[in-house]
Regions:
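Conserved glycine-rich FAD pyrophosphate-binding loop
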Residues: 19-151
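A conserved active-site cap/scaffold subdomain adjacent to cofactor or substrate pockets
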Residues: 1-23
């Protein structure tokens, strides 16, 4: 019976041919790049795979584009920076942090950055991060204040 069915290699070759013919990969990367570089407001989200429906709902008032990779626990959002952007981001970040996730502000207009910390709250390992930074940069000359917690 097994001899009568196509081999796994043959099935994979056919699948590969179908995917290439559909140009799905090009569309995937085009969408990914559009979201990662589009608009003055860009955020990176980390969440449990089951949490992306809520993330989508929390960030929808921003009116931008989203791309979620739930199996990776990673997502990106971008778009305009409407007036309530800082409060929407703060609410979304609070919900994510309570569930073990995070929201990092990758780009935003100055008025949004002034109202929300780009990195969010320092992690529990912050003391260790501080000691490592102090060991490698005792004079604090390398990018001072540009990382989480002002590192």
């Amino acid at each position: 019976m097994l001899n009568e069915s196509p081999s796994i290699e043959e099935q994979l070759a056919r699948l590969d041919k179908m995917v290439k013919a559909s140009r799905a990969e090009e569309g995937f990367w085009a969408r990914h790049d559009q979201v990662r570089t589009g608009g003055p407001l860009r955020v990176k989200v980390a969440a449990l795979p089951t949490g992306f429906a809520e993330v989508d709902e929390l960030l929808s008032p921003l009116g931008g584009a989203f791309v979620w990779y739930p199996s990776l626990g990673l997502g990106f959002a971008s778009g305009p920076a409407p007036d309530p952007a800082a409060s929407v981001l703060a609410d979304a970040r609070g919900a994510l942090v309570r569930r073990g996730g995070s929201l990092v502000l990758q780009a935003a207009p100055p008025e949004v950055r002034a109202r929300i910390d780009p990195w969010g709250p320092p992690p529990p390992s912050f003391a260790l991060l501080r000691r490592v930074k102090d060991n490698f940069d005792p004079d604090h000359r390398l990018n001072p204040g540009r990382f989480v917690g002002g590192l």
